[in-house]
Amino acid sequence: MAHWVSLRWIGHASLLAPLLAGCSDERIVFREPVNPPPDANSGFLGYFTATDKQTTCGNCHIGHQRAWLNTAHADAYATLAGSGSAQTFCYSCHTVSNKGNATASPAGWEAVADTAYHDVQCESCHGPGNTHVQEPDAPASAGNPPLAHVGVLGDSATQARSCADCHSGTHHPFVDEWAQSAHARSLEEEPGVFVADNPSCASCHEGKAALAAWGVTSNYAERGLTGSENFLGMTCAVCHDPHGSAKKADGTPLAGQLRFPIDVPDANQNLCMKCHQRRSEPDATAARGPHSPQGPMLLGDAGYKPAGFDPDVQAVASTHGSERNPRLCAGCHVNSYTVTDQATGAFQARSVGHLFLPIPCLGPNGVPTTDKTCAYTASARTWGACTSAGCHGDATTAAAAFTLSRQRMDDLTREIWDDINADDVVDDADGGYLADVVAIPPAEFLATDGRVSPAEGARFNVRMLRIVHGGDGSSGVHNPFLAEALLRANIEELKATYPGLPALRARVQEIMNGPLGAVTKRPLSRPLISRPITAR
């Protein structure tokens, strides 16, 4: 882009004086790519030309300017103005102001309501850019260059509120919900078990490490800070690119400024599955159990496959991954809805799905909570994620299907292994087939024999499909027909491998004799990219 600035002819007087005699005009051949900031006190520059949304920053940072134009941030002012519900206090989050950056006092639009400050521009997150454009080559110092923060909690000197300044509150509680979610607590694998400093865990438990693992090279305020006090959870900017969305195969940007797609059934490319796929099959050289196998489970490719395992791949792979649920994980775990007063219809609150709970318990005002102890009934929880695609007709139907699936999983897993003393070790104090197998020589639970025995494979699947640490976490609901197919095959293999095991309980035998759940076949949204289920 050409910019016109003043160019003066200057030369050595002895050589140029004859040429310049009588010459007093000045020709305009360039223009400085910077306008004086409307709010000179803060140094917020804003738009270079507001009519075509050319930011001052974008005169040099061309790639970021181009990507930003495709975001909702670039139309934030017009969106608010055209909403019919704009209030004066709303504009600071739809313009360049002190919201979203480290500027403490009212600045930008809050100080000077100029069109140069319309929309959520670069400086909304980075802070004032005037010092940087005046001294772009100056050694790095506080505020120059102005770096945005990836942290959002604002609970330390190195964590500004950034996104939280605007993406919070009753109408858009993204950070309010996120702060209660497991993504905010990712530094610990479970309460008291800190894992963010473990190199093998950090890329999925610490925000900066995740960005590095995904090849993000953009600089930000916390990037070079070391020490556990500067660790970040899975904050907004880990999943969302503030500069603009990644592109689909056809060149169009992804929705929501996401770094990776959420609708691709490939565990290595799907945003959620980049972490939720760590260990979904047993390791013949170690006794480690499953760890975050949700992605492969959803796609129909998780678990130990007993000998001859060859289920109806269409059924097990398409349970929650069919064309009716194109957003896959996010289709159930990121569900937005508005709560209104039942008597008047007036707005009360909004949920934006950033607790990442598919069927959360409801508080007295109808807003989801992090409580996981309420009943699995149509009234105690919200089932909107289950009913919105039309797969489950209403909340009562969805709750009944969920309860039935969990009961079948409980019956099958306890028949295989009931860890009565809750020590996660198969021993003779437990119940189920594995408690009988553990007493049979030679030992069937050796991590050093280079094989996965039928007993070890069954143990892996039970660990994966029960609500236990590291497992699928849904009691098989991510893919109930794959879960049931695996457990039924485990039981058959155990009976064939270890003669003398007792007869099955009556209701388990009934499950074994019946069809594989109430399978309703639907076509996959696209062919599986991950490895299909095959017999071993």
Where do the protein language model's features map onto the residues?
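Sec-dependent bacterial lipoprotein signal peptides
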Residues: 1-21
